[in-house]
């Protein structure tokens, strides 16, 4: 089963993936962007705000996604795969940027993934207040520097992207305690 943990920055994706790894010790744990060597370099370029063009950023993420699907996801489809972000994030960010048509976004992502999508998305949702608090407690990267309003638009776009891609979506209140969130995810994984 291929699942992805989605959510805006600080929602707790990494924490939940670490908890899930305790329950699925043989799972393939990966992330997008950055799940391959090429992806790590692409992630570094984007997070350090080295790319100014939103179209160039979109194309870099597509390149990472294609490589990630070919090198990590496709060879392991018979195993449990848990990904920190997925095609859903790529579509959501592109929708919010608004520089590329929805049709083109979906077509290019379908091309990059070969139609291989997670079977289920777990979206960790934050309130405006909780997001403000969490962001105030860390050094912000290039994407987080775009602001709270931008990140909340991304959160809404993650829901839209899941629907556009016809991927089953489980919404989770990320303000709950860590163990409650983990249990909710486990209850919704059908193996």
From Swiss-Prot:
The EC number(s) attached to this protein equal 2.7.4.9
Q: Where ATP is bound, by residue?
A: 7-14
The answer to whether keyword Signal applies is no
The Gene Ontology terms for molecular function here are: ATP binding; dTMP kinase activity
Any one annotated GO CC term: cytosol
Q: Where are the transmembrane segments?
A: none
Out of the domains of life, which is the source?
Bacteria
Q: Name one GO biological process term.
A: dUDP biosynthetic process
**Which Gene3D superfamilies has this protein been placed in?**
P-loop containing nucleotide triphosphate hydrolases
Recite the UniProt keywords alphabetically.
Answer: ATP-binding, Kinase, Nucleotide biosynthesis, Nucleotide-binding, Transferase
Among CDD domains, the record links this protein to: TMPK
Q: Catalyses which reaction?
A: dTMP + ATP = dTDP + ADP
Q: What Pfam families does the entry give?
A: Thymidylate_kin (PF02223)
Task: Fetch the HAMAP family from UniProt.
Answer: Thymidylate_kinase
Its function? Phosphorylation of dTMP to form dTDP in both de novo and salvage pathways of dTTP synthesis.
Report the sequence similarity comment from the record.
Answer: Belongs to the thymidylate kinase family.
Q: What is this protein called?
A: Thymidylate kinase
């Amino acid at each position: 089963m291929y699942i992805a943990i989605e959510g805006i920055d600080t929602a707790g994706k990494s924490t939940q993936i670490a908890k899930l790894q305790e329950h699925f010790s043989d799972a393939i744990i990966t992330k997008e962007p950055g799940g391959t060597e090429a992806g790590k370099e692409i992630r570094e370029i984007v997070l350090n705000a080295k790319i100014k063009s939103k179209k160039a950023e979109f194309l870099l993420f597509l390149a990472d996604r294609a490589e990630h699907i070919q090198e990590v996801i496709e060879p392991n489809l018979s195993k449990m795969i848990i990904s920190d972000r997925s095609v859903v994030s790529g579509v959501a960010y592109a929708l919010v940027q608004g520089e590329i048509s929805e049709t083109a976004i979906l077509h290019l992502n379908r091309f990059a993934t070969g139609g291989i999508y997670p079977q289920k998305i777990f979206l960790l949702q934050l309130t405006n207040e909780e997001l403000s608090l969490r962001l105030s407690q860390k050094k912000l990267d290039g994407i987080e520097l775009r602001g709270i309003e931008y990140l909340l638009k991304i959160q809404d776009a993650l829901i839209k992207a899941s629907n556009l891609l016809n991927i089953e979506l489980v919404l989770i209140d990320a303000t709950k305690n860590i163990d409650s969130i983990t249990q909710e995810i486990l209850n919704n994984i059908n193996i």
